[in-house]
Amino acid sequence: SAETEKEMANMKEEFEKTKESLAKAEAKRKELEEKMVALMQEKNDLQLQVQAEADSLADAEERQDLIKTKIQLEAKIKEVTERAEDEEEINAELTAKKRKLEDECSELKKDIDDLELTLAKVEKEKHATENKVKNLTEEMAGLDETIAKLTKEKKALQEAHQQTLDDLQAEEDKVNTLTKAKTKLEQQVDDLEGSLEQEKKIRMDLERAKRKLEGDLKLAQETSMDIENDKQQLDEKLKKLEFMTNLQSKIEDEQALMTNLQRIEELEEEIEAERASRAKAEKQRSDLSRELEEISERLEEAGGATSAQIEMNKKREAEFEKMRRDLEEATLQHEATAAALRKKHADSVAELGEQIDNLQRVKQKLEKEKSELKMEIDDLAGNMETVSKAKGNLEKMCRTLEDQLSEVKTKEEEHQRLINELSAQKARLHTESGEFSRQLDEKDAMVSQLSRGGQAFTQQIEGLKRQLEEETKAKSALAHALQSSRRDCDLLREQYEEEQEAKAELQRAMSKANSEVSQWRTKCETDAIQRTEELEEAKKKLAQRLQDAEEHVEAVNSKCASLEKTKQRLQNEAEDLMIDVERSNATCARMDKKQRNFDKVLAEWKHKYEETQAELEASQKESRSLSTEVFKVKNAYEESLDHLETLKRENKNLQQEISDLTEQIAESAKHIHELEKVKKQIDQEKSELQAALEEAEGSLEHEEGKILRIQLELNQVKSEIDRKIAEKDEEIDQLKRNHLRVVESMQSTLDAEIRSRNDALRIKKKMEGDLNEMEIQLNHANRQAAEAIKNLRNTQGILKDTQLHLDDAVRGQDDHKEQLAMVERRANLMQAEIEELRASLEQTERSRRVADQDLLDASERVQLLHTQNTSLINTKKKLETDISQIQGEMEDIVQEARNAEEKAKKAITDAAMMAEELKKEQDTSAHLERMKKNMEQTVKDLQQRLDEAEQLALKGGKKQIQKLEARVKELENEVESEQKRNVEAVKGLRKHERRVKELTYQTEEDRKNVLRLQDLVDKLQSKVKAYKRQAEEAEEQSNINLSKFRKLQHELEEAEERADIAESQVNKLRVKSRDVHSKVISEE
């Protein structure tokens, strides 16, 4: 097209213009090149003259400098070789130590495997005991069901007794005459009941004392049982005096109620005993965990501990079997008593009709019982003697308790003396630590003074160096001038070569442009329409190239102008250099003298610096030794503090025991005082009984006349009895409801107790699982600690290397002083940590020695040692793989620690729930006590009514009285058998309670051990992290020192190369100077 042709024409014109400009530039360039050649020849002549004169001066100076640098470098090379040899020796020692540690690790791993096997056995035994505990809880649930059945039967009996009471209440109006005598007897019965309750309280106190003083408590129990038997005999005699079979039946009912209430109380006590047994169980579990820790430290003792645990488990199994047998016997006894009570109920219903006939026979027995009462009074005197004997026994108990109190006080005084001694040791250690800190401060002050002196020396050396530099400036000015002239020459040569290269590049560009133009022409002719856009781009590129060419031409012109200027400047400088050469010859002689004097001063200052450096090192060693002593003192102080804490705990325990003993003594004194009161009351009762007997004789004669009237009034009473029976039925219904409520509340408390037991068992299983996990974590942590110790030893070797490199850096370079101070601080910190680790290592080595001695004693382990020697090679490979796995295991340990924390939180929430349940149980027990008091009040009301009814019934027939007396005797025998069975059942239940308390205590101790292990794992993790950080810092420092060493080595090699090049140049310049000198002589 036309446009492309125009553009091509324009391009051709521009190309021709550029060709012309290039031709002009080439012509100018040729002229400049010719001028440059002439100038270069002149310059070379001048340089040869200047170099010939200046080289003679520079050669001597360079030789001196090179000799000094060579000596210094040789000394450094020697030091580096010596360090390398020391490092090799250290590496060899470390490899030997590593092998020893690997051997020890393999032995410890095998011991740990043995311990794990024993732990697995112990866990199996624990599971077996837990299953036994579950079986016992099921049996307890069965017993609770039987108790519920017995309560139901008791309600039925109460209903029957209430019916009989309703029948008797019909005759209340007819027995007003005997109320006075009966009220007196009731007062006596109430007093005896109060004494009985006091005796029960005393018995409970004695049972508490039984846990600490079993022998004394047995005697007290025997005396209390004798007193109870005496009281029962007194009750029986008082019942005979009353001559009322209905009263006797009512008393038996009351006794049944009281026994049931006692059973409720005993069940509550059993629940408390089970809680105590749980606490004991947790204690035992904590003891077992402690034994496991001791097993990990002493391998041989672990075997003995496991055998002892197996024996303990066997004993526990035997105890559980005994408890099962006791429970089965108790259930059989309860069933037998239930059947007997049913029979009694049937017999009592049949015999109620015959009671009216028996009442008439009472009159004849009254005269017989008159003589019997006198005998009973004599028996009461005998009982008083037995009470006095019991008092003597209790006084003996008090004496023994006082002796124990005195012993406890002596122990307390000993502990107090120990505490005072420990406090004195603590004060002494404080003073020693203060002295050590003061000595450390003094040493630090010495070090600071020495460092200041060193800084002053370095400042003086720097001042001398400045003087040298100022004096050598004049000397070096000439050398710089010569070097600048040489550099200018080199620059001119380089510029000339660059211009030639630029010319060649322009020619190449021109040829490329021509070829591209021809190509574009051919392409334009063929593809003119299609390639318009490509032509435009090519046009732009050509325009840019033309601009670049123009700029290059301008740059060449500017260089030519600068070359002319440099030519004139060089001519002026050559004239100045000739003058300076003459001056430098004069100053050389002066500088030689000054340099000799300066060398002497330098040698003196170097000697002083070395002395100060030696003093510094000695002070550092002293400070390190002092720091180690301070660390040891701190360890001793911490140990003394731990001992103090243990003594304080023991003191607290002793104080608690003393308080318990004082309470027991006070309670025993109260008991003695109460017994004296009882004695006085019995004397009063004796006199009152005699008076009552006389009144009863008079009243009986008066009542014989009234018996006839009573028979007439009986018919009237029957109608009233029917009316009252309906009222009593309503009261019975109310009592039934109250009893049902009580039974339901008891059942709910028992269900809650069973749930708490199941929860405790679940928690126990969880804690055992957590224990196993924590033991595994401990093993991992021990392995990591061993590896950290190895890394620390490696860091010790690296530390020594870094210390040597730092010393070299201090001598060689002033710039690295600040880095040296930082490194020294780090080194001190590392050394302190290393010393701590050494202390821990020494402790581990002591434990290892103990284990080795135990291993030598054990014949079985000797055979294992032979197999261990063969497996050491395999364990070495395993250790290398374990190192790679440790990081993963650390993450697992962290995760497990978090899981353990969550489990601990759950356990805390469970404990809070248990506390709430305990509060609920306490509330229910308080409610039961209130119910008990209400029941006692109702019983007293019923007794009053019974007494009145009995007074009315005295006017009945004698036959009924005889039958009722026989019935009363049978019931008394049955009651005695029932009481014996109840005592045996109570003993079995108390054993169960103790066992449950022990188990709960073991679970609590296990939870504490788990928390302690978790704290241990956290501490180990923090230590491992600190060791990792220290190792990384040491590696970084070693890498920095290695890089510095490599730089120094590289600089040394470069300096040697420069010295060789300088020597070769000096030789060349000498040859050239000789040639120039010979030419000058020939021209002259």
From Swiss-Prot:
It is found in: Cytoplasm, Myofibril. The keyword Coiled coil applies. Pfam families: Myosin_tail_1. InterPro entries: Myosin_tail, XRCC4-like_C. The keyword ATP-binding applies. One of its GO terms (biological process) is actin filament-based movement. Keywords: Actin-binding, ATP-binding, Coiled coil, Cytoplasm, Motor protein, Muscle protein, Myosin, Nucleotide-binding, Thick filament. It comes from the Eukaryota. Residues 1-258 are annotated as: Alpha-helical tailpiece (S2). Residues 273-292 have a biased composition (Basic and acidic residues). GO terms for molecular function: actin filament binding; ATP binding; microfilament motor activity. Residues 1-20, 270-292, 298-317 are annotated as: Disordered. Residues 455-1084 form a coiled coil. One of its GO terms (cellular component) is myosin filament. SUPFAM superfamilies: Myosin rod fragments, Tropomyosin. Muscle contraction. The rodlike tail sequence is highly repetitive, showing cycles of a 28-residue repeat pattern composed of 4 heptapeptides, characteristic for alpha-helical coiled coils. PANTHER family: MYOSIN HEAVY CHAIN, NON-MUSCLE, MYOSIN-4. This is Myosin heavy chain, skeletal muscle.
